[in-house]
């Protein structure tokens, strides 16, 4: 496909061939997520949204390659914020609690009670951020595709709210870690 980019008359084919693996990856991942035996949690919802946005951005990029005007920003927003942003949030909500739990586990050496991973960041707060993120993806896509003050303001507010909730949740995990470490340090040492 990269050789076709050098030939202007075939660049549309190169773009279509480039979008095909991304779309196939999105469809396959959505299928695997649906077949998973593990219960779906909020981070799985971020992954589902991300894969749906990857599929839609592939379609939008293919339409741009075929000469449909005005979809460039839509393809970019769906890919960068809808796909990459959603997966980043979904992964952060798995990785950060695990790392906090792992470090506390090593520090405690089984002498102290430590919070489990579900207690490090509350599922309810993750769900609040998910709702803000879910609202911000289509609002941002619409606001950048059809610029209007009436669309831009709600998009900006929902994007800001979503990111503030993400920051709040990650800061809460840091606070939980620090308070657990402080409790371990303050505990009397047994001989």
Annotated model-derived regions:
Residues 1-191:
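Hydrophobic alpha-helical transmembrane segments of multi-pass integral membrane proteins
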């Amino acid at each position: 496909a990269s050789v076709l980019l050098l030939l202007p008359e075939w660049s549309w084919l190169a773009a279509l061939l480039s979008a095909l693996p991304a779309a196939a990856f999105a469809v396959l991942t959505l299928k695997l997520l649906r077949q998973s035996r593990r219960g779906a949690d909020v981070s799985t919802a971020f992954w589902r949204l991300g894969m749906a946005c990857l599929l839609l951005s592939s379609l939008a990029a293919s339409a741009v390659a075929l000469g449909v005007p005005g979809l460039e920003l839509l393809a970019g927003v769906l890919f960068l914020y809808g796909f990459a942003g959603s997966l980043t949030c979904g992964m952060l909500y798995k990785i950060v609690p695990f790392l906090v739990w792992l470090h506390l586990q090593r520090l405690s050496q089984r002498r102290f009670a430590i919070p489990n991973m579900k207690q490090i960041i509350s599922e309810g707060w993750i769900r609040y951020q998910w709702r803000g993120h879910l609202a911000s993806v289509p609002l941002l896509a619409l606001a950048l595709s059809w610029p209007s003050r009436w669309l831009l303001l709600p998009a900006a507010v929902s994007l800001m709210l979503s990111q503030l909730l993400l920051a709040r949740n990650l800061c809460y995990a840091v606070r939980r870690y620090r308070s657990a470490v402080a409790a371990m340090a303050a505990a009397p040492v047994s001989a």
